[in-house]
Each structure stands twice: as structure tokens, then as C-alpha cells.
From Swiss-Prot:
<protein>
    <recommendedName>
        <fullName>6-phosphogluconate dehydrogenase, NADP(+)-dependent, decarboxylating</fullName>
        <ecNumber>1.1.1.44</ecNumber>
    </recommendedName>
</protein>
<keyword id="KW-0560">Oxidoreductase</keyword>
<dbReference type="InterPro" id="IPR006183">
    <property type="entry name" value="Pgluconate_DH"/>
</dbReference>
<feature type="binding site" description="in other chain">
    <location>
        <position position="190"/>
    </location>
    <ligand>
        <name>substrate</name>
    </ligand>
</feature>
<dbReference type="GO" id="GO:0005829">
    <property type="term" value="C:cytosol"/>
</dbReference>
<feature type="active site" description="Proton acceptor">
    <location>
        <position position="182"/>
    </location>
</feature>
<comment type="similarity">
    <text>Belongs to the 6-phosphogluconate dehydrogenase family.</text>
</comment>
<comment type="function">
    <text>Catalyzes the oxidative decarboxylation of 6-phosphogluconate to ribulose 5-phosphate and CO(2), with concomitant reduction of NADP to NADPH. Is the predominant 6-P-gluconate dehydrogenase isoenzyme in B.subtilis during growth on glucose and gluconate.</text>
</comment>
<feature type="active site" description="Proton donor">
    <location>
        <position position="189"/>
    </location>
</feature>
<dbReference type="InterPro" id="IPR006115">
    <property type="entry name" value="6PGDH_NADP-bd"/>
</dbReference>
<dbReference type="GO" id="GO:0050661">
    <property type="term" value="F:NADP binding"/>
</dbReference>
<dbReference type="InterPro" id="IPR006114">
    <property type="entry name" value="6PGDH_C"/>
</dbReference>
<feature type="binding site">
    <location>
        <begin position="33"/>
        <end position="35"/>
    </location>
    <ligand>
        <name>NADP(+)</name>
    </ligand>
</feature>
<dbReference type="GO" id="GO:0016054">
    <property type="term" value="P:organic acid catabolic process"/>
</dbReference>
<feature type="binding site" description="in other chain">
    <location>
        <position position="287"/>
    </location>
    <ligand>
        <name>substrate</name>
    </ligand>
</feature>
<dbReference type="InterPro" id="IPR006113">
    <property type="entry name" value="6PGDH_Gnd/GntZ"/>
</dbReference>
<dbReference type="InterPro" id="IPR013328">
    <property type="entry name" value="6PGD_dom2"/>
</dbReference>
Length: 469
């Protein structure tokens, strides 16, 4: 019997859909799932396709041509380690494991090192696009040994999303680079979603827009600079009616946002690297505070503040101001995310190509947006650009739109409407463009109570003052 070209372990939604995607591009596939009933179920769905079901790890490994290419689609963490351990006795030198799960990049770095000692290649691969993307074409971010990537590259390119005929996948860098970039992608996604939700809140609470009007506004925004998957689906969300009440479905959804922790990982890494990531971090905190529903309801009856009074005049001008505020904040958020990737690349010697990363984000993934082309062009102009805000294209926009962001935040603050990520974006912009910040006082305080020393503006050296004298 001929051997299959690639194997997939794990037949939950993402694994199943990736297996079908791979087969649809002309590759033969073996599958294995810990529970055989899942395998049977999948084989029924894949009837007539070039897919072989296996019922033990040994049978699965033996069904594959060498060097074996195995895609792991199991739960991140201990389940991935357990699966790798069960595979190892059956693998041979130069076999390739591809981890397509939502894995923490430090776990990928560890596994890469451990498996290299056994002669096994390990490719930690970020996959974005959800259930539909897995089936029709996701954005794929592989990291690991470059020579191993060359062997799986034809498969990854074939199954990825395409934009202008270009595959939305590229070699990201060594060891944990692929999963790191996917993690930052998810952090940017948190920022995008929070900024959109704050825009919605202002339009609904302060401007009093109905669901139908909100649909029209977001659909119109999606035709211009904000053209993106998240704006597109937001416009669609406002058209959906609840079958039970007849109300817009969004109005009966509980305001408690869930999360899987990847936004938190992004913020933790930024803290470790000493990189400012306020918008994304504020977006993570916003989800935390949203989860405190009972406490917030109690506080709403005890703590006073401005009463929201819908604005009735100059609505069109204010809607345009919110659009500009959203786009400027989005630029600041991406600037922070790409600056974090730059810091990580320098820390871990990954040599990330930021323009290429922007290009593969254009299709298949959740943050896909037209303006990613502009990010790519910015890095074409200056491959080692310190911050996107310093690129001429983005500099001109933020300078032009900052007035709108200030106006929208002022309006929200006056009405008592929380806009933590908008406020964070403006504070970041103002801090970044300020040559002299009040950190001199912080250094004086640190030296006062802890003798932590300080530097001076007028001469070289490290200084300490006896403040109590």
C-alpha cells in the first residue's frame, strides 16, 4: 500500500478542517484521533477522499512516507507534550512535527531544543482564521528549522489563504518565532475588537444610533480606510435579530467577554521585554472588568457620575470623528504590536521580516485588513523602522486624525462613557512624541528612598544624592 504524504493528529474542528483542506489541494492524508469514534465520524465525512484513518500511533506513523510530516492539532500544553512523547519511539531522524495549536512560544522553544537532540525537526506554526479559515485557507506562521520548513512549504502554501495570488504564509524564523508572531497577532486582535466595541458604545450611547443605523455606519466604514474582516462582521452583527424577542441579537447578548489567554500572553511578553503595549493590555483588562458583571451592576447603583445624554446635533460630523479616532487608535495598536515583534526578534535573534508578516496577515486571519498593505510598504521603505508612527504615511494620518481622537475622548469622558483603549492610544501617542517626560521625578524618588541612583541631563555618569541632608 502506498504511503500518505502527511498525517494529522487531532480531529476537533480545526484539525478536521485542516485535514480536509490539505486533501482538497491534492495531498494524501492519514489521520489519527485518541478517541476512535472521532476518527470514524471523520472518515464518514471524508468518504471518497484520499484520507486514511488509523487507530494507533504506531499504525499512524507507519502509514506515512519518509521523512514523515505530522501536523499536531491537539490542545496546547500538556496534551501536546503527551502526544509528542507517544510519537517519539516510532519516529526516525529527520521526521518533521508541525504544531498547529495555540501554543505558548516558550513551550515551542523548549520542544524545538529537546526534539533537535533526537534528530526530529519541530515547526511551531501559528494558524489563524478559525473554523472557516482552516477549511478554506488560513494565515499560517511557521517557525523552526529553515531546512525542515522547505520540505513542508509546498503544503503550507497550498492550503493557506491567497491575496492577489500570493500565499498568506512565509517562513517566520527559528524555534518559537512562528508561535510568537501568532501570539502578537492575537494581541492585536484583542486591541482591534476593544477599539471597535468602544466606537460602537459611543455611537449607541452618546449618539443614540439604532442597530440599523449602526449597520449602515460600519458597512460604510468598511468601504474605506477601515476595510477589514472585523469591521465587516461587525456591520453584519447589527442586522441579526433575536428569534425569541425580535430585538437586535447584540442587545440581548450578556456583556461579559470571554478569552483564551493569548492576549494576556502578549502583554506578559511585552512586560518581560520592557516594551510599551498599552492598547492591547488595556483591551485585556477591559475583558477582565467586563467579566465582573455582578459587581458592576452593584456599583452602578452606588457610584455616581455623569448621566449619558444622547447628542442630537452634528451627528454626521461626530460619526466621522469616531471613524478617524478608531483608525488612528488602530494604527497606534499595530505600531505597538510590530514594535514588540521587533524587540522579540532582537532578544531571540529571529531576524523577523516585518513587511512579510504584514503581507501574510492580509488574508485568512482575523485581523486581515486593507491597511496591512501600507504597513508592508512602510517596512519596504525602512526595514528596521523603529515604530510605524515614524513612517511618512502613518505620520501624516495620525497628525491629521489626532484632533478627532481628542474630541471623541473628551465627549466620552464628559458623558461618563468608558473608553479605556481610545484613551490609552492617545496617551501612548502623546507620550511617544514628548521629548521630556516627568520620569526625572520618579528617578529622584527612587534615589531618595532606595539609593537607586540617577543620570543627569548636563553631564555623563551615575549619581546619588543624600536627600535627607
Amino acid at each position: 500500500m502506498s504511503k500518505q504524504q502527511i498525517g494529522v493528529i487531532g480531529l476537533a474542528v480545526m484539525g478536521k478542517n485542516l485535514a480536509l483542506n490539505i486533501e482538497s489541494r491534492g495531498f494524501s492524508v492519514s489521520v489519527y484521533n485518541r478517541s476512535s469514534s472521532k476518527t470514524e465520524e471523520f472518515l464518514q465525512e471524508a468518504k471518497g477522499k484520499n484520507v486514511v484513518g488509523t487507530y494507533s500511533i504506531e499504525e499512524f506513523v507507519q502509514s506515512l512516507e519518509t521523512p514523515r510530516k505530522i501536523l499536531l492539532m491537539v490542545k496546547a500544553g500538556t496534551a501536546t507534550d503527551a502526544t509528542i512523547q507517544s510519537l517519539l519511539p516510532h519516529l526516525e531522524k529527520d521526521d518533521i512535527l508541525i504544531d498547529g495549536g495555540n501554543t505558548y512560544y516558550k513551550d515551542t522553544q523548549r520542544r524545538n531544543k529537546e526534539l533537535a537532540e533526537s534528530g526530529i525537526h519541530f515547526i511551531g506554526t501559528g494558524v489563524s482564521g478559525g473554523e472557516e479559515g482552516a477549511l478554506k485557507g488560513p494565515s499560517i506562521m511557521p517557525g523552526g528549522q529553515k531546512e525542515a520548513h522547505e520540505l513542508v512549504k509546498p503544503i503550507l502554501e497550498a492550503i493557506s489563504a491567497k491575496v492577489d495570488g500570493e500565499p498568506c504564509t512565509t517562513y517566520i524564523g527559528p524555534d518559537g518565532a512562528g508561535h510568537y508572531v501568532k501570539m502578537v497577532h492575537n494581541g492585536i486582535e484583542y486591541g482591534d475588537m476593544q477599539l471597535i466595541s468602544e466606537s460602537y458604545f459611543i455611537l449607541k450611547q452618546v449618539l443614540g444610533l439604532s442597530a440599523d443605523e449602526l449597520h449602515e455606519v460600519f458597512a460604510e466604514w468598511n468601504k474605506g480606510e477601515l476595510d477589514s474582516y472585523l469591521i465587516e462582521i461587525t456591520a453584519d452583527i447589527f442586522t441579526k435579530k433575536d428569534e425569541e424577542t425580535g430585538k437586535p441579537l447584540v442587545d440581548v447578548i450578556l456583556d461579559k467577554a470571554g478569552q483564551k489567554g493569548t492576549g494576556k500572553w502578549t502583554s506578559q511578553s511585552a512586560l518581560d521585554l520592557g516594551v510599551p503595549l498599552p492598547i492591547i493590555t488595556e483591551s485585556v483588562f477591559a475583558r477582565f472588568i467586563s467579566a465582573m458583571k455582578e459587581e458592576r451592576v452593584k456599583a452602578s447603583g452606588l457610584l455616581s457620575g455623569p448621566e449619558v445624554k444622547p447628542v442630537t446635533e452634528n451627528k454626521e460630523e461626530l460619526i466621522e470623528a469616531v471613524r478617524k479616532a478608531l483608525f488612528m487608535s488602530k494604527i497606534c495598536s499595530y505600531a505597538q504590536g510590530f514594535a514588540q515583534m521587533k524587540a522579540a526578534s532582537e532578544e531571540y535573534n529571529w531576524d523577523l521580516k516585518y513587511g512579510e508578516i504584514a503581507m501574510i496577515f492580509r488574508g485568512g486571519c482575523i485581523i486581515r485588513a486593507a491597511f496591512l498593505q501600507k504597513i508592508k510598504e512602510a517596512y519596504d521603505r525602512e526595514p528596521e523602522l523603529d515604530n510605524l508612527l515614524l513612517d511618512s504615511y502613518f505620520k501624516n494620518i495620525v497628525e491629521s486624525y489626532q484632533g478627532a481622537l481628542r474630541q471623541v475622548i473628551s465627549l466620552a469622558v464628559a458623558q461618563g462613557v468608558p473608553v479605556p483603549s481610545f484613551s490609552s492610544a492617545l496617551a501612548y501617542y502623546d507620550s511617544y512624541r514628548t521629548a521630556v517626560l516627568p520620569a526625572n521625578l520618579i528617578q529622584a524618588q527612587r534615589d531618595y528612598f532606595g539609593a537607586h541612583t540617577y543620570e543627569r541631563t548636563d553631564k555623563e555618569g551615575i549619581f546619588h544624592t543624600e536627600w535627607m541632608k
